[in-house]
């Protein structure tokens, strides 16, 4: 499996965010997106997730399902946790699991995902009572509940304490070991080998 971008360009709100952006990320590898605010890190993740149109260039995911759009093979975790306050922790995750898989999800699968992010003891608690860090953990539980080969993570450590970050890094590490791909916009050093794509207002550069 390999994610390949060739001469990508993105325009948002009539402003060109980036252009001529090319990179390759093989299966089992992660790429960290770096740079100051407003240079296009979030826009790039949203573009790969199919939420922003490709203005120019090509984007391919080889080794995946050829007849399935990249967006349907990816997990996108943005700044918003997208939870319903009135639903319980378990109900929120079950909803997203059904939505992402188009099929019922076994209770054991939901429990395992909640356990992976440290929320199993709060399964029956309405989401409105969760702290910001717990809400982030619940959003991250989608990664464990439904298997998808491409993870697109926008500041995934936001609001997480040290334990929460450790659980996230464990999830990402297992995903990479299984041959998955991860792109993460983050200012936090990741505890595994990553390639870095640095974006800047004047352009971008790639670093090992």
Positions of PLM-derived features:
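Catalytic Walker B motif of ABC-type/P-loop ATPase nucleotide-binding domains
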Residues: 151-155
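Helix-to-loop junction immediately C-terminal to a conserved catalytic motif
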Residues: 49
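Q-loop/switch helix immediately C-terminal to the Walker
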Residues: 80, 85-101
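Conserved ABC transporter NBD signature motif
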Residues: 54-72
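Hydrophobic anchor residue at the start of the ABC signature
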Residues: 140, 179
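Conserved ABC ATPase "signature" region
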Residues: 107-122
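Conserved ABC ATPase signature
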Residues: 126-133
């Amino acid at each position: 499996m390999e994610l390949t971008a060739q001469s990508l360009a993105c325009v948002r709100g009539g402003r060109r965010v980036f252009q001529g952006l090319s990179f390759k990320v093989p299966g089992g590898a992660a790429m960290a997106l770096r740079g100051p605010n407003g240079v296009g890190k979030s826009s790039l993740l949203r573009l790969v997730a199919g939420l922003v149109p490709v203005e120019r260039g090509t984007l391919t995911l080889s080794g995946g399902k050829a007849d399935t759009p990249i967006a349907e093979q990816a997990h996108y975790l943005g700044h918003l946790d997208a939870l319903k306050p009135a639903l319980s922790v378990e109900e929120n995750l079950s909803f997203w699991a059904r939505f992402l898989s188009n099929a019922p999800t076994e209770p054991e699968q939901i429990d395992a995902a909640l356990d992976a992010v440290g929320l199993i003891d709060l399964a029956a608690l309405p989401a409105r009572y969760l702290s910001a860090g717990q809400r982030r953990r619940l959003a991250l539980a989608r990664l464990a509940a439904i298997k998808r080969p491409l993870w697109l993570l926008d500041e995934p450590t936001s609001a997480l304490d040290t334990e929460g970050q450790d659980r996230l890094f464990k999830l990402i590490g297992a995903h990479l070991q299984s041959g998955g791909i991860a792109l993460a916009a983050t200012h936090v050093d990741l505890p595994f080998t990553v390639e870095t794509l640095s974006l800047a207002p004047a352009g971008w550069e790639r670093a090992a």
